[in-house]
A protein has these predicted regions:
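Hydrophobic pocket/interface hotspot
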Residues: 79-84, 90, 146, 174-176, ...
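Hydrophobic ligand-binding cavity/cleft-lining segments
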Residues: 27-108
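Beta-strand/loop substructures that line and gate deep hydrophobic ligand-binding cavities in soluble
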Residues: 149-200
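Glycine-rich portal/gate segments that line the openings of hydrophobic small-molecule binding cavities
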Residues: 58-60, 72, 92, 102-154, ...
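Positively charged n-region of N-terminal signal peptides that target proteins for export
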Residues: 1-6
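Sec/Tat signal peptide C-region and signal peptidase I cleavage site
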Residues: 21-27
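Envelope-exposed proteins and targeting segments
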Residues: 65-69, 133, 142, 160, ...
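Bacterial N-terminal signal peptides
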Residues: 9-20
């Protein structure tokens, strides 16, 4: 808990110290993209520390749940992988996702890395609440899979591995291995909404790919 309090304090301080000439804020957030980038760095530093220092065990008040979901798409694996691994294509096909803010994009050792923040409107008790999910995506084109680690207040962690399997005859199976970590009070809400949003995204991308829109 003390680490989380220090993280939040650092996050607030980082936002205040940003230059006044940063890009203007968007309608969906009160922060500029530069401020969101500072939040991403603070969240990532905390995330890395937290993952090493603790584990989701009962005595920590946290829980971990894993789920696998899959969908078959009538399109070649190369095309499905290219479209699906580009998070910009998820906007408009995910009920919560409003936009993606990319902070850094680079390739190292054949792996494509993307540091990003997803701006989402998540319904809580029927009221949409704007949240920021800070994450890193690692795309492995040679293996036809990508991984994502993300962190959202209040200390909700999600690990993803999305695998693309060639079924032959121009068909592809997309399997998402999802791992959610949250407090025992939030884990059911996190898993239910997380799985539902991923299934909605899967269906939206399938329709867009098969129709030729993407």
């Amino acid at each position: 808990m003390k680490q989380l309090v220090r993280f939040l304090a650092a996050l607030f301080a980082a936002a205040l110290l940003l230059p006044a000439l940063s890009a203007p804020a968007r309608a969906d957030t009160i922060e500029t993209d530069a401020q969101i980038a500072a939040e991403w760095q603070a969240a990532w530093d905390f995330y890395k520390f937290y993952q090493v220092a603790t584990a989701p065990l009962p005595y920590t008040g946290r829980s971990r749940v894993e789920r696998d979901i899959s969908i078959d798409i009538d399109a070649p694996r190369e095309h499905v992988f290219e479209v699906y691994s580009n998070f910009d294509n998820h906007v408009g096909r995910h009920s919560f996702l409003q936009r993606i803010v990319t902070h850094k994009d680079w390739t190292d050792g054949g792996v494509h890395y993307v540091n990003f923040t997803a701006i989402e409107n998540i319904p809580i008790a029927g009221v949409p609440v704007t949240t920021k999910t800070h994450g890193q995506q690692r795309v492995h084109p040679d293996g036809f899979y990508y991984e994502t680690d993300s962190w959202t207040l209040p200390n909700v962690v999600t690990h993803q591995k999305i695998v693309f399997t060639d079924l032959g005859d121009g068909r592809t199976r997309v399997t998402e291995h999802l791992m959610f970590e949250a407090s025992v009070l939030l884990i059911d809400f996190t898993v239910t909404n997380g799985v539902a949003s991923h299934q909605e995204t899967q269906a939206g991308l399938k329709e867009a790919i098969e129709s030729g829109e993407l």
